[in-house]
Amino acid sequence: MPRVKRGVTARARHKKVLKLAKGYYGARSRTYRVAKQAVTKAGQYAYRDRRQKKRQFRQLWIARINAASRQNGLSYSRFINGLKKASIEIDRKILADIAVFDKVVFTTLVEKAKEALAK
């Protein structure tokens, strides 16, 4: 069986890692060993933060809805409960947009939630 020299595959793998590390500071973008660690860690951060991004946006939406509903005299939890009782199914992303950009419509939603809670 002939000897297999691994220069081609090793170079390809090194090039791939160094390409991913392009733009990193110092040896992280030039040295394979350090670049490999940096790329691996960057991948871990990216994986984690793709999940955290969803949580952070939901927190932001809830904070905006809470602020707007309190201006209309209702806490966030009571507002959401009122919407559910009034059979109004709008997700938090849309509610937050309405709260920021269309205060008249949001006030109407708060009034409907108050009516549903009073029943």
Curated annotation (Swiss-Prot):
Gene Ontology molecular function: rRNA binding; structural constituent of ribosome
Xref: Pfam families: Ribosomal_L20 (PF00453)
Any one of the GO BP annotations: translation
Tagged with keyword RNA-binding: yes
Database matches in InterPro entries: Ribosomal_bL20, RIBOSOMAL_L20_CS, Ribosomal_protein_bL20_C
Key words of the record: Ribonucleoprotein, Ribosomal protein, RNA-binding, rRNA-binding
HAMAP family (alphabetical): Ribosomal_bL20
Family, per entry: Belongs to the bacterial ribosomal protein bL20 family.
Its job: Binds directly to 23S ribosomal RNA and is necessary for the in vitro assembly process of the 50S ribosomal subunit. It is not involved in the protein synthesizing functions of that subunit.
Name of protein: Large ribosomal subunit protein bL20
Gene: rplT
